Amino acid sequence: MHRLILRFFATAFLVLLIFAARARAEDEVRIQEEIWALPLALPMFAYLVRPVGDGPFPLVIMNHGVSLKPTDRSFFPLVEFRDAAKWFARRGYLVVAPVGSGYGAQAIDIPERALYGPFFSKVGKCTNPNFHDAGLAVAQVDLRIIDYMAAEKRIIPDDVIVVGQSAGGWASIALSSLNPPPVKAIIAFAAGRGGRVDGKPNNNCAPDRLVEATADFGRTSRVPMLWIYIENDTFFGPALSQRMHAAFISAGGRAEYHLMPPFGNEGHFFIGSPDAIPLWSPLVTKFLDAQK
């Protein structure tokens, strides 16, 4: 018995050493941060971070959320999800975090002067929202980014992960319905559309229609997905996100669902905090390892 106990602790200690060595190796990877202008049909800036070296590397695309007001979009940061993106880069990925069309300098909507920026992911009025096309619009941008980065010989064309938050997560779910061959897996944080109508917590735009649209995407989606939501998300609360997941799975989609404990004052922006990385990274690591 004494020998068995010693063997158990020796094995456990060895496993801990392996994980510690892996963590140190990942943290010591040198990375390089850049700002790119992507010459797509609708040109856009992107934050890019990658390991130092020529590559090619597996690709991660990170889709941000939506701001409906032009003023808010005009102040949108050029670098979004920096800490999360660097986490992926230290694990060998080239990460592209595009700033959507209609954000930053392109947020020029002045209706009284008949000036409108190229913001194309509105869902319309809550009486008849079009969640479906709003998601697919951003999904098409992801496909163009994959094509462009592959043509530049910077990435491994058949090794792409797509990550999205909020409306960007919704676009990632939409992308999964297209089953693009290069995309191996998709990770959605706090995904959805139509949250906090009029700025009111847990006040959603046509939630039944959102669930229906989720099921519609699930009918054709076969890409492995990881969905992460947070208990104190006032945009897409647990009851709604669980309904969405159930509808998606019942329709045929493949998605692993996790509801995380409350985080800060508002869980919706979980992925944007460096303090959240130790909480979500084990789930993401396990999920991505399972796709290899």
Question: In which residue ranges do the predicted regions lie?
Answer:
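N-terminal cap/lid segment of alpha/beta-hydrolase-fold proteins
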Residues: E26-G55
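Short substrate-entry loop that stabilizes the transition state in hydrolases
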Residues: G55-F57, G65-A107, G237
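Alpha/beta-hydrolase
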Residues: N63, P98-G100, F189, M260
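Alpha/beta-hydrolase active-site loop
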Residues: R113-K153
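Primarily recognizes the serine-hydrolase "nucleophile elbow" in alpha/beta-hydrolase
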Residues: Q140-L210
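The feature captures the conserved acid-bearing segment of alpha/beta-hydrolase catalytic domains
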Residues: A185, A191-A251, E256
